[in-house]
């Protein structure tokens, strides 16, 4: 009986020592000064890490988010995000307003107008609709009317106007990437093609303006209203990082448009349409019903329906990948 009693007393003393040690650990007593890390604290950190790992992922909107134009100036600033990442920026240089697009997040789509090129087996017709509308970030004008002889037009393997060697060409491949260059002089590559829009010669090549931008304005770069050298003009370029740059101005010569693109980083560029009635670009806010349009170019006349209703001319849309 005495031995049993001594054993019970030793057990009680051992229990008290364990409780004391636990209390000291809770007060920082085993790890040094209060607030220090103790072995017991290290063990109890497991559940906290598990809770951190189980934190729910952030959910982004299922459509591009437009942040507004802000103050236009020479510095690029974000205007569109896709899944939390910047997909488009805006800047204004030499009086030229530019939208720059990250092709990893968005892609270019060529639309056929109801009159130009007219009805046909086109996948993308005279208005933006359906799932494309829900992923719409921006849209803007394409090139000259096809009966001017400015170049060819094809989409989805169907040809409206045959392509011409040497013409400035906006080539979109089936993987959704777009390149710009002179047809059969660097483009196309061997990739399957989704669409090609040609217009005149390259306005910018290897970061240099075409030699004719000052000396051959109407003959080389299109007839203008009233034969004016300075009119609304637009272009689409690509920079060294494969980002697309839409550039437009309500009043410029070809030289000014080209310089704006070069200052914005464009390596190659094709002039698009000119004159006030046909130069327009929009960003789109999403909500209920039709997206709300936001004009991009200061002073632009605009397009009836803002590319969300049938339009007679062909145009480009920028949509989320």
Region annotations inferred by a language model:
Residues 28-162:
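Zymogen propeptides
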Residues 112-263, 267:
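Aspartyl protease catalytic domain
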Residues 97-101, 168-172, 234-238, 279-283, ...:
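Short beta-strand scaffold segments in enzyme catalytic cores
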Residues 278-321:
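C-terminal regions of proteins
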Residues 147-148, 276-279:
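Active-site environment of divalent metal-dependent phosphoester hydrolases
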Residues 17-26:
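Bacterial N-terminal signal peptides
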Residues 269-272:
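Active-site neighborhood of phospho(di)ester-bond hydrolases with catalytic His/Asp-centered motifs
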Residues 4-16:
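Bacterial N-terminal signal peptides that target proteins for export
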């Amino acid at each position: 009986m005495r031995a049993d009693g001594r054993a019970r007393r030793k057990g009680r003393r051992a229990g008290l020592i364990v409780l004391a040690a636990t209390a000291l650990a809770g007060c920082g007593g085993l790890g040094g000064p209060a607030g220090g890390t103790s072995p017991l604290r290290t063990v109890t950190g497991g559940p906290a890490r598990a809770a951190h790992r189980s934190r729910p992922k952030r959910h982004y909107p299922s459509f591009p988010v437009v942040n507004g134009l802000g103050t236009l100036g020479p510095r690029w600033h974000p205007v569109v995000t896709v899944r939390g990442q910047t997909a488009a920026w805006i800047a204004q240089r030499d009086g030229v307003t530019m939208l720059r697009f990250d092709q990893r997040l968005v892609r270019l789509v060529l639309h056929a107008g109801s009159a130009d090129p007219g009805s046909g087996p086109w996948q993308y017709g005279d208005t933006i609709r359906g799932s494309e509308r829900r992923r719409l970030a921006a849209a803007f004008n394409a090139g000259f009317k096809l009966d001017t002889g400015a170049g060819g037009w094809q989409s989805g393997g169907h040809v409206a106007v045959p392509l011409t060697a040497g013409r400035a060409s906006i080539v979109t491949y089936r993987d959704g990437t777009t390149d710009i260059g002179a047809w059969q002089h660097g483009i196309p590559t061997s990739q399957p093609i989704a669409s090609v829009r040609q217009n005149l010669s390259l306005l910018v090549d290897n970061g240099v303006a075409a030699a004719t931008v000052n000396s051959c304005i109407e003959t080389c770069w299109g007839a203008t209203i009233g034969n004016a050298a300075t009119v609304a003009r637009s272009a689409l370029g690509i920079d060294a990082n494969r980002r697309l740059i839409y550039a437009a101005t309500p009043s410029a010569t070809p030289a000014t448009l080209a310089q704006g693109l070069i200052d914005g980083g464009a390596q190659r560029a094709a002039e698009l349409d000119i004159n006030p009635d046909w130069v327009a670009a929009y960003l789109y806010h999403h909500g209920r019903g039709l997206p709300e349009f936001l004009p991009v170019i200061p002073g632009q006349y605009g397009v009836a329906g803002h590319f969300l209703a049938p339009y007679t001319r062909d145009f480009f849309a920028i949509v989320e990948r």
